[in-house]
Amino acid sequence: MATKFTKNQQRAIEEKGHNILVAASAGSGKTTVLIERLIQKILSGVSVEKFLIVTFTNAAAKEMRERLEVAIEKRLKVADESQKRFLQEQLLILPAANISTIDAYALRIIEMYYHIIGLDPQFRLLSDTAERKLLQQDVLTDVLADFYDENNIHHEQFLTLVNNFGNPNQDDQLQKIILKLSDFAEARADGNEWLEKLREPYEVTGEPLTATALYVRSIRPIILEIIKNLIKKVEEVQLTITGIDELKKTQDAFLEIQDYLLLIQDKAMVAPWDELREAILDTPSGKINSQTKAIKEDPDLSATLEVARQIKGQVVGVKSQMNSLITSYFALDEKSWQLVQKESYKLIDTLILVTQAFRESFRRTKREEKLLDFPDLGTLALAILSDDVTKQTIQGQFDEILVDEYQDINQLQETLLTSVSNGHNMYMVGDVKQSIYGFRQAEPSLFTNKYKQFAKKESDDIRIDLADNFRSQNNVTNITNLIFTQIMDETLGDIAYAGEAKLVPKAAYPDDVPAVFHMDIIVEDAEEDLETDTEVFEKRQAQYALLAERILKLRETSIFDRKADPAGLRPVEYSDIAILTRAKSGYIDLVSTLRAAGIPVQVEGVGNYFQTMEVYLMLDILRVIDNPHQDIPLAAVLRSPVFNFDENELAAIRIADKMHDYWTALQAYAQQDQKAQNFLNLIEKWHAIATQNDLVALIWAIYDDTAWLDYVAGMPGGAQRQANLHALYEYARTYQNNTHSGLFRFIRYIEQLQSGDSDLGEAAQETDAQAVRIMTIHASKGLEFPIVFLPEFDKSFNTQDLKGGLLIQKNEGIGVEYIQPDALVMIPTLQKLVVQQALKRQSWSEEMRLLYVALTRAEQQLYIVGSVKVKGEAGNQSLKSLWQQSKNANGQFLPEFLRLQADSYLKWTIMSLARTKNKVLEDWLGDGQLPRLVGSETPLTGKVAVTLTNQNEIHAPIASTKGSELVEDGTYSPMDFDRAKTILNYQYANLQATQTAAYQSVSEIKQIFEDPDLAQMQTAVITENGQLQPANVLKVDELPLPDFMNDGSQKPSSSAVGTATHLILQLIDFTKINTVQSIEKLRDELVENKRILPSVAPLIEIDEILAFLQSDFAKQIIAHQKTLHREATFAMIMPANDIYDTLEDSAPVLIHGIIDGYFVDEASQTITLFDYKTDFVRNAQIDEDLTKLQARYKGQLHLYQQALQREYVGYQVGDPQLIALNVGRVISVK
């Protein structure tokens, strides 16, 4: 059935001849529209080679390519003969099409045109973030050493800079600043020019302060905004108290405050700095008689008393705002500020000098080592495009440049793409409301500028809005609109959430599907506003416990599912639920709480690889080998299960030498203890390997000598632990292959990964599909879930970027704190105050967009969980104050100063509900008065269910465990004896099934199909009454000898050779390995990695493998590389009597196995499975032996066939292909 597109979707598909910006809101079918646009262009004769399609992740590019391939194949089935050939050509060239990340495309330009800029083509991409940081650190260390040199002409200025941010012995802070400044510059096409301009705000030109660009452009707007908001607040108070005679003096006091604010507003426009400062310092007393005796004693004036109390709070708020101005911008007079600016200019000038020196040195080092990093890609590609001939050539290659997720683009990437464009063929798709990658230098203003410009009638370019939301149940969409039509505008959020920017509910759900937008507020008693670590933990635990309880209850309900029959409803499954968080910090507690409640979980993207016990211990061993004079790693290694020194032995080591470090004490202790001496001998052996710079050999030697791999296999989660250790070996090999060597540098590399929040996920293992998914909001972007939970909604926004001695903001530049050397006084410069305010707006805007992403992930039900203190939060930032001020606000959007005061998603949400009817919140926070009308853009049809729960009443649910009840008094009733007799006399109905293995491998049960009587001839067991009875379990008697029993004299078994041959065929690259030498190389690598025994390797028939690789069937495999599956595991249930003729019942048996390989032909919807066999076949009797071979494995292969047929519904699984390697024949098994 063809997709029915909306009017705007159709426009987005068909429009051409302009630059086009598609503003695609959440759930608007953006990807479907993109693919349809591409397909329509292809059907009109435009080749996929004529498209440049860029997005921001490799996964997104891969998905785009796959979806386009599926769409072409679909059209191919219904195409006429004239189109078929063209579409088939498109499928052939699709793998080489320009569908990639922007960096990948820039790399392609460099690889093709490197000669234009004189670049050595033998470069390596520095894609490892930790490796790049290490190289940066080494280069920076050398650069700083040069500036520390007294002979350097900038030495004195440099020392002043160092002392402003630390001291020569502790310049870590300065190093971080230089690296961060460099990163900002690298995200721009004009990086060097941007750095040079950072001095400008600090230049003292002699002109009055209020005439400088810094004041006119930045400081004055901030002052006027604050004053405007305060005047508005004062006017609202005056309206409230007008006509109340008892508050006449209060009215006079507010008139005085109003006159004061109006005076400052005027002077900010024209007065010199010192005159303005004097006016601001002359604050009115603001004394009000808000609680006179007459008001208190008259019960009829209780409402007036409440108003008076509120007014007092408003006065406190006004004074607080003015005090913040006085203690920041107006802390100094003009002469003092100019002195601070002058000295700060010297700091900034030196900082830029050092940063430029670092950038140049880093660039030179990369060239010398033939390295390119990701920022280089865009810069060098632009340098190539500066050649006019090359630029015109590249521009002529593309009919259209399609940019997905355009809101996440940075300035350098924008410049690159516009350089490739011919000026009217850019097709940009995105949603600025979902721009959440500011930490990667994403520039949402690039989107918003076009959003406004392209909407103008005189513009040659066009904007198309896709606002229809086909994902979320209408109530979720309406509440999302209710919130954002009040908090997101151009000043906070970068776009006014109104008109076309709003979501339009279009999702088709039946009326009986529950409309759930639930807010759980946990109320906690607290006397102090400042939270201790214990309070944070208890608050978090309470939220997680409540969340677990909600999930368990949801499992008893139903959700809508279009695939469900007959009513479209089915029970809620764990996999329907996602928990989205702002950060990963609470994951350990969250997972623990959910699992304790019996809820399975799957955690996405948690970097905890280096924290796993088995890997952490290996890193400690490496640290000890590199430098044994580290007490903590050494003690950890000794105490570990590998060496098993107990507390008494550790104490004895310390006693052996109390004066020196622990390593020296261990050496002394080893003179009288063999166990300690053995440890020293091992460390010495490993150190000798380490000195040879063979990191890979060292790690494997540790595994060999300690049997650590085998040990962890016996621990809980043993397979995962072994995978982690194998992964460490692979990381080391990759590191070493990248021309790096040395244990010390590898340890630094790992520590860089850890300290840079770049920890890796554990080695991949199969995950439980039926589990609640836990991920960050960032990771959830682009995904959707039937039910979404948002815990820790009260968590304060991260303000780390607003702190520190130097702040950087892409538009305002850098703000520095100047430390006066003599007085050691730290003074935030005016520029720093401006930058800090800009950073706060930028950070709050990003948080607002993150909130939008979080809310729009939910399809049917959304649950918010947060905690609130009922005491301790004083002043105008208290939740009650925010509620009241929001309730009394005028206009569509809540006042900006209120939105900036709120510091959590919960506060924004509650503020948005203040002007709606919500009885629970009004009873809790309100004053009983009716709210002001909310703006016309805000829908009032949505329903928010609010639940208030005391934290002390929450208890985490625990999964129930069934067990027998204990009788404590030792007495038993007749009912107990009857129950016991029933249990003892119980006859199990399926006794035969207990004598049959419920879990059987295909390689074992294939013997039954080979000889049906074999089941009767299996090992018999003797029962207690002396009767013989078959065990009904198939066994493989041939087991490899353990290493300590194998002296090398025993010839490897044929099965061992067969296993090794299978391993080679499992790992071989059909497209590259096609010679005897290449197969032998792979075999030798597997021997070196100890995956094939040295005694087995010579027995592998290389010629047989090569003959197969050159066969027609191998060519079929190569043609289906994209759909080829090797070593595919499966499991399926079969009735026992289908396998065991001796059984009468049909009790289920779990069959598991591994298929050597199969490939899928999407065009014909068929599957071909194949299986390698190394059995000996006699050439003289080849037909007879092949017939026996076919009979021997027929049952096994038919089980594989059944398994694939169950997995691929709608596909036809053909006859299995048995590959007899010994004679190079492929047999079709009927």
UniProtKB/Swiss-Prot annotation:
Residues 500-782 form the UvrD-like helicase C-terminal domain. ATP binds at A24, S25, A26, G27, S28, G29, K30, T31. Its cofactor is Mg(2+). GO terms for cellular component: cytosol; DNA helicase complex. The keyword DNA-binding applies. Keywords: ATP-binding, DNA damage, DNA repair, DNA-binding, Exonuclease, Helicase, Hydrolase, Isomerase, Nuclease, Nucleotide-binding. GO terms for molecular function: 3'-5' DNA helicase activity; 3'-5' exonuclease activity; ATP binding; ATP hydrolysis activity; double-stranded DNA binding. InterPro entries: AddA, DNA_helicase_UvrD-like_C, DNA_helicase_UvrD/REP, P-loop_NTPase, PDDEXK-like_dom_sf, PDDEXK_AddAB-type, Restrct_endonuc-II-like, UvrD-like_ATP-bd. Pfam families: PDDEXK_1, UvrD-helicase, UvrD_C. Residues 3-473 form the UvrD-like helicase ATP-binding domain. It catalyses: Couples ATP hydrolysis with the unwinding of duplex DNA by translocating in the 3'-5' direction; ATP + H2O = ADP + phosphate + H(+). The keyword Nucleotide-binding applies. Its EC number is 3.1.-.-, 5.6.2.4. GO terms for biological process: double-strand break repair via homologous recombination. It comes from the Bacteria. PROSITE patterns: UVRD_HELICASE_ATP_BIND, UVRD_HELICASE_CTER. The heterodimer acts as both an ATP-dependent DNA helicase and an ATP-dependent, dual-direction single-stranded exonuclease. Recognizes the chi site generating a DNA molecule suitable for the initiation of homologous recombination. The AddA nuclease domain is required for chi fragment generation; this subunit has the helicase and 3' -> 5' nuclease activities. Belongs to the helicase family. AddA subfamily. This is ATP-dependent helicase/nuclease subunit A. It comes from Leuconostoc mesenteroides subsp. mesenteroides (strain ATCC 8293 / DSM 20343 / BCRC 11652 / CCM 1803 / JCM 6124 / NCDO 523 / NBRC 100496 / NCIMB 8023 / NCTC 12954 / NRRL B-1118 / 37Y). The lineage of its organism: Bacteria, Bacillati, Bacillota, Bacilli, Lactobacillales.
